[in-house]
């Protein structure tokens, strides 16, 4: 550790200087200031007094009173209050002062050294100022946590967006899996891609819609049964007799009470005669077993109107008169058409 110079040591240094300067009494050493009064008290170190003892070649020489114009107050405050320089930086000037005293004792020419240039002084000053600025920037970074908060908010938003996208993709994949299970895969072990799945679904939907629009595509209509053929044959025969009965009705025949349009026989067989059933008629299915006596019954009903239709030949009227007592009335039909109950007797109809 360095130590301060005593007054006795300063006296010795002064005597050595006077001895060397005796041939030139008019010459005054530039850097031999008198020790301040504060140095006499050994236990009271003062930084400005110590700085005045530094050599002009030392980088800290710009803090001497000769260079007080270059931010002396800031630099002195930095040296006095810096915690990092309390032990190391403060000890360096003392060591250098001791070495300077020894050099003065040996040679006595320490005052003739060259002073540092202004460029070097400015460089040292910039270094010190740069250190202060760096420290201030570090403090400002620590005091401004807003950037960290902003980064935290952005990170949370990014994580939330990633979670939403992950859920959306999971739902989309689940929907495609269900669609693959519905559409026909034709025993294909390979898993269809999303594009192929959509194409197959489109084709499948179009095929189903066409099938609904044309339900009987590729099916031949069933052939008509034998009963339907017999029905058409006998209905054509009845229509011919119906034309003759209509002519007689125009000549002056009055329709029997309860007459009405012919009932439409229900069933799988379709005919060209369609109309609502009368109140007195019965809607029954036509059967081929009823039609063998159809022509005789129709002829008998027509011949019963011999008085109303004199145009008919007389030879045909005799069998009609003989068989008239055995036949039942025409079930109140006036159009000469076959009635389903024409084969019943009067007793059956009355009951």
From Swiss-Prot:
Intracellular or extracellular location(s): Nucleus
Single GO biological process annotation from the record: Notch signaling pathway
GO cellular component, one term: nucleus
SUPFAM superfamilies in alphabetical order: HLH, helix-loop-helix DNA-binding domain
Tissue: Developing nervous system, and in adult epithelial cells of the gastrointestinal tract.
Domain bHLH: 156-208
InterPro entries given in the database record: ATOH1_bHLH (IPR032661), bHLH_dom (IPR011598), bHLH_transcription_factors (IPR050359), HLH_DNA-bd_sf (IPR036638)
Comp. bias intervals (Low complexity): 247-256
GO MF, one annotated term: DNA binding
Compositional bias segments (type: Basic and acidic residues): 332-351
Iron-sulfur among keywords: no
UniProt region (Disordered), positions on chain: 16-39, 89-116, 244-278, 308-351
Keyword list, A-Z: Activator, Developmental protein, Differentiation, DNA-binding, Neurogenesis, Nucleus, Transcription, Transcription regulation
UniProt keyword Lyase present: no
Extent of Pro residues compositional bias: 26-36, 258-268
UniProt-listed Pfam families: HLH
PROSITE patterns cross-referenced by the UniProt entry: BHLH
Role according to the record: Transcriptional regulator. Activates E box-dependent transcription in collaboration with TCF3/E47, but the activity is completely antagonized by the negative regulator of neurogenesis HES1. Plays a role in the differentiation of subsets of neural cells by activating E box-dependent transcription.
Subunit description: Efficient DNA binding requires dimerization with another bHLH protein.
Name of this chain's protein: Transcription factor Atoh1
